[in-house]
Amino acid sequence: MINSIRIGTRNSTLALIQTNLVIEQIKQIFPDINCEIVPIITSGDLIQNKPLYDIGGKALFLKEIEQALLDKKIDLAVHSLKDIPGKIPVELVIAAVLEREDPRDVLVCLNYQSIETLPQNAVIGSSAVRRKAFIKKIRPDLNIKVFRGNVDSRIKKLMTGEVDAIILSYAGLKRLNVFNQKYCHLIEYSKMLPCIGQGVIAVEIRKDDNAMFNICSQINHLPTFELIKPERAFLEYLDANCSTPIAAYAQYLDAYNIQIDFMLGNLDCTKIIFQTEITNIKTSKICGIKAAKMMLAQQ
């Protein structure tokens, strides 16, 4: 019987909140297990003055944590699924996810309630090329300023007038308890498809760790786990990085079938391709790969 678990995570406020959500799930089923949080500073946290696509992509938020997992300095790692690349080290596996939070993006703005109503040539703070592609599709006149850093620092830049608006994920704002309906406006899926895995907290372990597999199987939210399969299959086949505008969002139509909306753009965000597929859960991963092949052929 396992007495304690060392849980690796980024040292940000949001990452620690998400880690505690995982611990709550573990404690509900295994109340006697001691959970030790091991905060790890990642390269992505240290380099804040450059866009992710210039310095190695979102994998920079995982590199040191995954190495600690491989070195057996921690027993499991907690990540935002949206930060996990399509391909991870062969010795590791995503063994569990928590129930998905609303994955929509949010326009945070003091004076306007939508991208459409922003003034001509307004400035939006965002670092994601996916968001840039959708913004340019909705409002080609808008200027996009590369914004990185935690939620508090981004909101501070908005409050000081550095930009007219910023775009953040609803899940992060809610978990930080800073979603304010007066200034935070949800963007519907039809206007901005979420990042692959957005809203999902993921647990990564070593493939050969049977004890951790057992624990993860107890906390895994299977409906969410099934939905992320086609999204991540799409991502893995394209081998996309932070310089590629890409999105996918799967949702249940009924107990057995799901709808997946895909988006793929070119590097300068001037061309965006959309595709929608309906498939059985059992074939959803194949569907994600099929969509990737078809959309690549259209580029």
UniProtKB/Swiss-Prot annotation:
GO terms for biological process: protoporphyrinogen IX biosynthetic process. PROSITE patterns: PORPHOBILINOGEN_DEAM. It catalyses: 4 porphobilinogen + H2O = hydroxymethylbilane + 4 NH4(+). Binds 1 dipyrromethane group covalently. Pfam families: Porphobil_deam, Porphobil_deamC. The keyword Transferase applies. InterPro entries: HemC, Porphobilin_deaminase_cofac_BS, Porphobilin_deaminase_N, Porphobilinogen_deaminase_C, Porphobilinogen_deaminase_C_sf. Belongs to the HMBS family. This is Porphobilinogen deaminase. The lineage of its organism: Bacteria, Pseudomonadati, Pseudomonadota, Alphaproteobacteria, Rickettsiales. The gene is hemC.
